[in-house]
Amino acid sequence: MSFQNSLSLSLVNPTHALCMVGMEITLDISKCAPDKCKSFTIRGSPRILIHISSSVIAGKEDTVVWRSMNHPTVALVRMVAPSPTVDEDKVLVSYFCPDQEVPTATAVLFLTGIEISLEADIYRDGQLDMPSDKQAKKKWMWGMNGWGAILLVNCSPNAVGQPDEQSFQEGPREIQNLSQMNVTVEGPTSILQNYQLILHTSEEEAKKTRVYWSQRGSSAYELVVGPNKPVYLLPTFENRRKEAFYVEATEFPSPSFSGLISLSLSLVEKAHDECIPEIPLYKDTVMFRVAPYIFMPSTQMPLEVYLCRELQLQGFVDSVTKLSEKSKVQVVKVYEDPNRQSKWLQDEMAFCYTQAPHKTVSLILDTPRVSKLEDFPMKYTLTPGSGYLIRQTEDHRVASLDSIGNLMVSPPVKAQGKDYPLGRVLIGGSFYPSSEGRDMNKGLREFVYAQQVQAPVELFSDWLMTGHMDQFMCFVPTNDKNNDQKDFRLLLASPSACFELFEQKQKEGYGNVTLFEDIGAEQLLSNGRESKTISQILADKSFREQNTYVEKCISLNRTLLKTELGLEDKDIILIPQLFCLEQLTNVPSNQQSTKLFARPYFPDMLQIIVLGKNLGIPKPFGPKINGTCCLEEKVCGLLEPLGLKCTFIDDFDCYLANIGDVCASAIINRVPFAFKWWKMTP
């Protein structure tokens, strides 16, 4: 018995055939008809659907169709369900001569229906469904009404530094994190002894996925499809109807990888002669998309704060620890990595997450500037179940912008008629090519673009010494949605707002009050600062010109942000902040540039630790008037009416010394978005 696409009937012996559920067989009615017969009837078992001319026969044993035989006639026969036993279903064709009520002859076709399929979570509801339209499995569609299965990348910290081709044997606990895929065989499997089931993908796709299977009687999971193993011959299923396989991806979408991976199950007929090739009969395919990694904005609720455990930063660490306790957020201390340059924690790392319907995984994206690291201490401090992803960079200079720390994420926004439910990634750079311009390298930038779900916006940040946008902007959450306002505010640094504040204090008679009153002379000198009065600052024309330049740079970004994020002026709060222009500091002489870059003149109040409504703001050490810092007072007056609570972190060296700033000292893991990425349309 074999699978056939077309059959001829016989009046001598019954015809026997295997039929794949859903596939059509062309049945020649005329070829075996007796010469004098002019008409025929056709009927089939309930599991058989018959198309003939404009009629459809289905569902009832006694349904019969009469047809004339004036011209050659064919019928299309299709099984709609698998047969319980061999030859269980049949088609009867009876031939009649003119004026005869009794058939002259009858031909019988015995069919055995077999159903072979790959099942996955096509509808993203946690269920392994058999779609009514099998062709739908071969496509992957975005959107609320979309479909298509999803794979997670294996980002286990234990796999960091291991070759992608290594064969892993997953334990039962870990295997549940993978996407399940079932191979189902329905029907009398005993007749499949001369056939072979093959699970396969392309050689290129095999490099990007791993499929595991635990055979009966074994507790280990065998790697059956993966790197260098694109094909797996399944053993005979015997009486088993369903086998569960577990699938993972080995890499995220990238410029050279769309994120789509197809897995197929094929049925082939074995040849009795070794010289004769096997014959492919049927193939079922499921299309998967690899889940992207998603960054969280500062407006998402915090889960954990990771702090660099350096003695020089102890004041900062203690302050942030207290703030975290106040916010009921766990604090994790990270030891300094001796193999890295001093600015490494948030400068080279970022928390994100990846998600499938059955699992959400928090992970660290690490972009080390030091090549060929032998170990990654950060992975040992992560919460169990977290992932660790390394993406190598190209520009290893100290002042390079080629790291993941050179980006931010906006809250969800709507701009120019399009929704961005997961926000937009903001990437800082030079804005145009130049010999001294600094940018994120093309490979890393396109890697971010390839995730598709947080459409990037490129901003101008090369004017800053660190190049980090968090020195002039920050997003904070609010509950104020009245008057069509958003549930967040964008804070922007504003030198002009600071000068206006100082001018106001000068008019009030406080022109002789100094900045950095509580900072010792040696500490100021080591940080390149000196104690100045309000009047001295206002009278310094060169300093004014430097901040005019900074204001123009920020204004350019403000215009871009309003357009690309759909912001209005009422969504933006100006924070008084001054800058000064200096040459790059703490870099080797061969990396020095004649270009001047902006650096915060006093600790940057935009570099905020956002823990829900609690804000950890760098203490600016501004002019004290009646015992109160006028800069702190101004910022509190702007933010506290929105329900935010301001705590000023007292650690001058942390923010201005060469060891780095708060950007390099802490990273925050946050609650993932409630919105599911597959429901959006990029």
Curated annotation (Swiss-Prot):
Disulfide bonds: none annotated. It holds the Pfam family PAD_M. Keywords: Cytoplasm, Cytoplasmic vesicle, Nucleus, Phosphoprotein. Expressed at very high levels in oocytes. Weakly expressed in testis. Expressed in primordial, primary, secondary and Graafian follicles, and in immature oocytes, mature eggs and blastocyst (at protein level). The modification Phosphoserine is found at residues 2, 434. It is found in: Cytoplasm; Nucleus; Cytoplasmic vesicle, Secretory vesicle, Cortical granule. Its main location: cytoplasm. Disruption phenotype: Female mice exhibit dispersal of the cytoskeletal sheets in oocytes that lead to a failure of zygotes to progress beyond the 2-cell stage and infertility. Oocytes are depleted of many proteins required for early development, such as ribosomal proteins and proteins that control epigenetic reprogramming of the preimplantation embryo. Male fertility is not affected: knockout animals are viable and present at the expected Mendelian ratio and do not exhibit any overt abnormalities. One of its GO terms (cellular component) is cytoplasm. The keyword Phosphoprotein applies. Phosphorylation at Ser-2, possibly by RSK-type kinases, and Ser-434 creates binding sites for 14-3-3 proteins. GO terms for molecular function: calcium ion binding; identical protein binding; structural constituent of cytoplasmic lattice; tubulin binding. Gene3D superfamilies: L-arginine/glycine Amidinotransferase, Chain A (3.75.10.10), Protein-arginine deiminase, central domain (2.60.40.1700), Protein-arginine deiminase, N-terminal domain (2.60.40.1860). Homodimers. Associates with alpha-tubulin. Structural constituent of cytoplasmic lattices, which plays a key role in early embryonic development. Cytoplasmic lattices consist in fibrous structures found in the cytoplasm of oocytes and preimplantation embryos. They are required to store maternal proteins critical for embryonic development, such as ribosomal proteins and proteins that control epigenetic reprogramming of the preimplantation embryo, and prevent their degradation or activation. In contrast to other members of the family, does not show protein-arginine deiminase activity due to its inability to bind Ca(2+). Belongs to the protein arginine deiminase family. This is Inactive protein-arginine deiminase type-6. It comes from Mus musculus.
